[in-house]
Amino acid sequence: MKILGIGNAIVDVISKVDENFIIKNNLTKSTMKLFFDENEFQNLLKNLKIEKTVSGGSVANSIVGISQLGDKAGFIGKISDDEFGSNYEEGLKKENVEYFYSKKKEGLPTGTCLILVTPDSERTMCTFLGTAGKINENDVSSDAIKKSEIIFLEGYLWDEGEPKKAFDKAINNANKVAMSLSDLFCVDRHKPHFLNLVKNKLDITFANEQEMTSLIEAKTFDEIINFSKQLNKLIVVTRGEKGAIAINGNEVVECDVKKNLKILDLTGAGDLFAAGFLHGYINKLPIKECLDKGTEMSSRVIQQIGARL
């Protein structure tokens, strides 16, 4: 197998709501709220008309993109034996992704992200991790990891104790490790640990400019470049409209992004960028072509609704 992803198996449930629904339920518009009470989450969900249900999760989105580009890819996650779990499984099978899953028959439901779309197209997300947040080292196949060229992980796995053990097992058995820092708040929560991973454990790090700035407490972007040069590892940083940059030792490669796109949804931009870049990387393309493929995939996904092509 070319690449194996390990991450939170989350089903995205999309529903259209009005502004009053956001206010009435004490939600902060255009942000993500993590729910810890299952009953509270289910009460919110049952009052809505579901427009669309699709398999999601950051690393899983990237893995699907890699499979769509023709590479053999797999995913390790945790779902429940329920309707959303079945939807998740079918979503990956449809995209020819090999799924090394653990399916629970009782207890917590499959992880769900409720995406509330207001008339102005803004998205407010409500997430209940459910079974996804319970992935552990026993769910991670050492054999599958050892047979994969690259393991791709998400920083979100550090938010729970058991997933962190799965993360550590993957790193210790992998041939090569790539990781997405996930988001700014995730970096802030785990800064010392992430810094150690970037310096000592990871072969490839994906981050946006804000995440890297926070990670090393940089004052300028040049500080990020200089920090990355010293590591002699591949650091890939996206910069929004400024494009993207890859630093590997003294090699610094940049690329631009397409301008004047009709942007509908930025949700999957980073996930699909990573998919395009890793596709190029595992097929031994020059770094510039890896960056170009990443920006191409990212540009495509932001012009549609949803995080998968």
Which residues fall in each region the model found?
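Glycine-rich phosphate/adenosyl-contacting loop at the front of the ribokinase-like
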Residues: 1-76, 86
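A glycine-rich helix N-cap at a beta->alpha junction
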Residues: 91-108
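Conserved phosphate-binding/catalytic loop of the ribokinase/pfkB sugar-kinase fold
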Residues: 100-105, 115-161
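Hydrophobic beta-strand scaffold residues
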Residues: 73, 99, 177-178, 235
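A short, aliphatic-rich alpha-helical micro-motif
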Residues: 144-146, 198-199, 229
